[in-house]
């Protein structure tokens, strides 16, 4: 047996098998079929019904038959030719089946992506927001809760009596300037149906910022672009309303809520219908009247919480140059008795909400202490008031403040109608959260990639003035809720 020579039939069969294998490998390489098809389609049909698996098996078998048909031809007498004659080749029907199966598997994912985008439409007066001037991608805020604020202050016993009158006066003047009914519930309802842009809000708070030069430039830019002779008076009265909310320990974040990024608007003389994106990517949102590919805000309002030069010690891993980062809307408060103030920023951090709150506690510890115990009593300077006492200990003023806050008595007969607003003491004998609140933040969105590539700076020129903007093209908006820091 070992010395037997193979006959011609065996040699022909071996040659035929070698030709078939080489032809199959060559056509698989050219057409991308064969063993590549199951590897590409396996993740798509993972968990699919058995019928789909049978379809894939039939497609693979027909693809192999098609390669044999291309290699040998229908007129050959080889085994590949006979097999191809018995089976159907990979044709248009099979391609249509693959396309339908792929679309059927991708459709739920596409629907889920579309469902993640949330758009809101609001009809608003254009006194405190100019959609045609702000431009797409600008942040808008709902101005809500004015009626609740008035009712709460009327029932509050720890505020100045004049504070309610100042708030009502500023609110009536603002309504009158905006052309709304100055009295009654109609004025409140119309005012609460309005939007406030981030630029207008920051322009109203310009006197309270420490970097007053940059924010004053923003205020001048807003006044020049608003084309409204009464806009300066509107900003002043809006500032008085927000100052009253800080002094009464209700804070602006209780009446201002982020509405989203402006996408498109239909403008009239004093009214506009505004569409805003609350959830989703601004870059992927389509159907816009003007190109809107990024979330934008003034550069003077930007606060980098990952920068050690601005915020001191940064936790390990928070100052990475790569990875994702979060974008927040941040309020900072100073609740001194006669000097209440507030600031608003757009902050960037690599930390989530829980980590950001701990970081803000470290960064603004001095502001937190000053808000707990006011530095300026109603009668004058804190230290001067203490030196006038017989015992000469200025710390006794804190004990007096504790007694006044606990007993709810008047501060001084010479101060008509004055109420102690320097300390709010809880039933446990410690300052409550309202008296110690120094900040509030709300998540706006998240972006992937390093900040250097995800951010770009542009300059907007209007009426001979220029304002620097920060643009975030890849930001995915996800408006959260306010979280107070105290």
Curated annotation (Swiss-Prot):
Q: Which GO terms describe its cellular component?
A: host cell nucleus; viral capsid
Which keywords has UniProt assigned to this entry? Capsid protein, Host nucleus, Virion
User: Which GO terms label this protein's molecular function in UniProt?
Assistant: DNA binding
Localization (cell):
Virion; Host nucleus
**What is the annotated quaternary arrangement, including any partners?**
Interacts with TRX2, MCP and capsid vertex component 2/CVC2.
Q: Which HAMAP family match?
A: HSV_TRX1
So what does this one do? Answer: Structural component of the T=16 icosahedral capsid. The capsid is composed of pentamers and hexamers of major capsid protein/MCP, which are linked together by heterotrimers called triplexes. These triplexes are formed by a single molecule of triplex protein 1/TRX1 and two copies of triplex protein 2/TRX2. Additionally, TRX1 is required for efficient transport of TRX2 to the nucleus, which is the site of capsid assembly.
> What name does the UniProt record give this protein?
Triplex capsid protein 1
Q: Which organism is it from?
A: Psittacid herpesvirus 1 (isolate Amazon parrot/-/97-0001/1997) (PsHV-1)
